[in-house]
Regions:
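Short loop->beta-strand "edge-of-pocket" segments that line small-molecule binding or catalytic clefts
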Residues: 30-33, 62-66, 106
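A general structural signal for well-ordered alpha-helical segments in protein cores
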Residues: 22, 38, 74-77
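Amphipathic alpha-helical segments within well-ordered protein domains
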Residues: 26, 42-43, 59, 78-81
Length: 127
């Protein structure tokens, strides 16, 4: 997967809420999001009052395809805990990195802290 992107929940929310960096995320589309990050995005949208089906449709309209979180990615995400915990990365963050590494893709995030350690994949931080 060259020139492919795996989106972190923060990048998808940035796009959907038209925040600073949304144009960059839009240029990365179509892209994928891992199931863990997808769950985070749905949770935030539902928390803000959006219906679950509407949230799902909104993500689909943006050409963001959810990918299952499998055993191999789970193992890699778990192994990243020791190097990323002190930086505050969540399970969703580590799951995104693991998926990007597995796909040979770039992880696109709004969290600059991802550039503070040696990630298993290329990382592009928007802010």
């Amino acid at each position: 997967m060259s020139d492919a992107y795996v989106l972190d929940a923060s990048a998808v929310l940035c796009l959907l809420q038209e925040e600073k960096g949304a144009e960059r995320v839009a240029r990365a589309l179509p892209a994928v999001i891992g199931a863990v990050d997808y769950s985070e995005v749905i949770g935030k949208l539902v928390e803000s009052g959006m219906d679950e089906a509407a949230a799902d449709a909104l993500i689909d309209m943006r050409q963001v395809n959810a990918i299952p979180f499998g055993r191999t990615q789970a193992r890699m995400a778990g192994s990243l805990r020791t190097t990323t915990r002190k930086l505050g990365l969540s399970l969703g963050d580590r799951a995104c990195l693991a998926l990007a590494a597995a796909e040979g893709a770039t992880a696109l995030t709004c969290e600059r802290v991802w550039t503070k350690f040696e990630a298993p994949c290329k990382v592009e931080a928007l802010r």
